[in-house]
Amino acid sequence: MTKQTLTQLEQHDLFLRRHIGPDSSQQQAMLNYVGAESLDDLTAQIVPESIRLSQELSIGDSCGEAEGIAYIRGLAKQNQVFKSYIGMGYYGTQVPNVILRNVLENPGWYTAYTPYQPEIAQGRLEAILNFQQVSMDLTGLDLASASLLDEATAAAEAMALAKRVSKAKKANIFFVADDVFPQTLDVVKTRAECFGFEVVVGPASEAVNHELFGALFQYTNRFGQITDFTELFAELRAKNVIVTVAADIMSLVLLKSPGAMGADVVFGSAQRFGVPMGFGGPHAAFFVARDEHKRSMPGRIIGVSKDARGNRALRMAMQTREQHIRREKANSNICTAQILLANMASFYAVFHGPDGLKTIASRIHRFADILAAGLQAKGVSLVNSTWFDTLSIKGLDVAAVNARALAAEMNLRFDADGTVGVSLDETTLRTDIDALFDVILGAGHGLDVAALDAQIVAQGSQSIPAALVRQDAILSHPTFNRYQSETEMMRYIKRLESKDLALNYSMISLGSCTMKLNAAVEMIPVSWPEFANMHPFCPLDQAKGYTQLIEELSSWLVNVTGYDAVCIQPNSGAQGEYAGLLAIKKYHESRGDAHRNICLIPQSAHGTNPASAQLAGMQVVVTACDKQGNVDLEDLKTKAAEVAENLSCIMITYPSTHGVYEESIREICDIVHQHGGQVYLDGANMNAQVGLTSPGFIGADVSHLNLHKTFAIPHGGGGPGMGPIGVKSHLAPFVAGHVVVKPGRVSDNNGAVSAAPYGSAGILPISWMYIKLLGSNGLKKSTQTALLNANYVMKKLSEHYPVLFRGRNDRVAHECIIDLRPLKEASGVTEMDIAKRLNDYGFHAPTMSFPVAGTLMIEPTESESKVELDRFIDAMVSIRAEIAKVESGEWPADNNPLHNAPHTMADIMDPEFDTRPYSREVAVFPSAAVRTNKFWPTVNRIDDVYGDRNLMCSCAPLSDYE
């Protein structure tokens, strides 16, 4: 009993051994199999010596879960959560506990991946279809996206759409009304500058005085005014102007829809529907347009199709618009969006139903009426004559009001011109109105909420003009009218969850996606009120905990990347790419080299790379790769020399998208630098770098980091994500700034790329916890274990499938690519067949046909145990044996378990199944592991072509429920 030291006994709580899947004995067995003595020996065999770090990271020691929680609890306590009336797109909300516990805090929802495999994602696809239905009903338009990143970036996407579809082809002006939220205008201006658009800002009525391709209006505006735009929109549309509207989702419950006024595009934040402010995010933006603009929509769209049995099935529609297919010609670079938050918003609408939403919205509006009536009774002047939830007040002693507000622990909006704003929300109580009277008027005002309410009821309210009161029904679909009891809601959420395969069931080995453990201990702080309920524009001295957390996380990321500074603002990897390219662009401009606009991109690059380059106003020149998948150095030298005068940068991924450490990476950086360019190193594969090498050490100038890959933020079924960028010192002055929050950095006055100054700050505690708990040694060991797992899988599968690319010593990095093209030629079995057959074995498919068509790219991550790796390997070996039966003719090419996969309960219940040349057991219980823990796909293979030819992106018709 005394063999272990006290130090060893104290380490039982260390997170490291919980995060890494293989235990020490499993690791040794795997090392023996791949032919390495230790993790360090394997690392030396794989990572080129020239780029290997000689020093350890300086993060600190690994720690236990209890210690990590205690430390971050101390940070949380430094935040002062005042009652917020700031508004400006961020509002207090009540997260229904049934959604908090069963969605936000449920790994069945937050660990899933984007539904590229729809047969095992029907649950979240239905939830997102509900979100699209909510968006369409409230905006009065035809087609909604599955979510965008935030309201401000949605505005930039609306501007881009307007230019694409406007018939005013010669126009180059985008008009923005001067009463939109300032952060929205900031992001629009940043995007417009890249596109070469002119942005004109002025009173809404002046839009008709310009030759425009598009215009943007806020409904209700930043001051709270509600305007009937019907005549203005008609006049603009007669001039071929695309009319876009930023709308408040809660107000639309009561107000005439922008679509009914004639808008072409309506967007906004769904945050008010049960998603905490989170110091700026994450929140889902809704984006809705007329049907005629569907091919120009940004982001994912969920559509209805049918499966092989003719049953209704959901899928991602019209994917040919998106970056992973169209690359630099895509409508947008958006990849990860905000699916988890969109799910929360859709469930909020389902749980409350139309009547509940009307009650919530009416209560907010009634409190605004009461506040206005009391203030006006005391002679206070309002800027706005109409309102839903926001009052803008003039003529106050601002200093005195602010002092009383801070003493009462509340934050109001204080504009530069002396206007004071008050925005009410779902959390507002009667006592809050009393407190607001005290703060605005001082003590002794004599106002009584009940008396004011009685007066309003007796006289009626005129604050929403009669012409702007919504007359049409909303959310009449049965889904929004049957789950208002918590029992029914809980079961509905569970019913949808059970249709989806997430990390809580099995490994998701998607190459280039890094589906590692999202540990419970990392997730816990996210829903703490000290982090969840902070307004992003609150005084910074109230956010000392957030400030310290962001500073510590930034310093750790600087250490990990080898850069000099980090910008946290980008709220997705694609936005990080855009932000990094903007920094390069601004840097060249500062040196008088504005003409440098060519971006070199290897042909193997992620689709977001060329899409982001196009977004940043750059011209893409593609460079070749050799047969080993490496950048063709001779072609790079030739291209770099040809465009040297105008070379802006290269975008390159490391390790390469082919899953190997290119030996010539430093030479690649040198070639670009010699011709005056900068090196953008895509951080998608950072999970193979941390602690072993770094972008800065390699020679890159800027990278984005996918916190939702390398640093443990969950994918959420398609978001949230975070894409902060690391930069060398010469680029630091050119990273994103923010028009509202200026913490005193050299980059403060630069344009923003996201609505909030720190992006989706509410999920930063996840990555902070991940790094804090693992420490320097744990981070390095995680990377080394990722390499071990990948090489173990690669070597095992290489006995049955060709492995397409290998690096030094016949090794791969953190992922491997198996080549299915020879099998397809010999048997007719496709990569799609294998992907769907894996569903029958209880697995999500690896990445299909990227970066090479006809392949599968497998990334197991460090979190998977040898037991799980072996289960996946056994499935792939079994599938190879099935393919052999097709090759031999034992099974027909058009009637076999692969061609017919995935199999459902309906299949094995079908009497006609007996005509198939394989048994029911082979179909649905192909392995012993599946027999004891079966995941059932709920639909058969989905017909993608039918879905796009018969586009339907709303809930099922009522007849389906009759």
UniProtKB/Swiss-Prot annotation:
Keywords: Oxidoreductase, Pyridoxal phosphate. One of its GO terms (molecular function) is glycine dehydrogenase (decarboxylating) activity. One of its GO terms (biological process) is glycine decarboxylation via glycine cleavage system. SUPFAM superfamilies: PLP-dependent transferases. The modification N6-(pyridoxal phosphate)lysine is found at residue 709. It is an enzyme of class 1 (oxidoreductase). Its EC number is 1.4.4.2. GO terms for cellular component: cytosol; glycine cleavage complex. Its cofactor is pyridoxal 5'-phosphate. InterPro entries: GcvP (IPR003437), GDC-P_C (IPR049316), GDC-P_N (IPR049315), GDC_P (IPR020581), PyrdxlP-dep_Trfase (IPR015424), PyrdxlP-dep_Trfase_major (IPR015421), PyrdxlP-dep_Trfase_small (IPR015422). The glycine cleavage system catalyzes the degradation of glycine. The P protein binds the alpha-amino group of glycine through its pyridoxal phosphate cofactor; CO(2) is released and the remaining methylamine moiety is then transferred to the lipoamide cofactor of the H protein. This is Glycine dehydrogenase (decarboxylating).
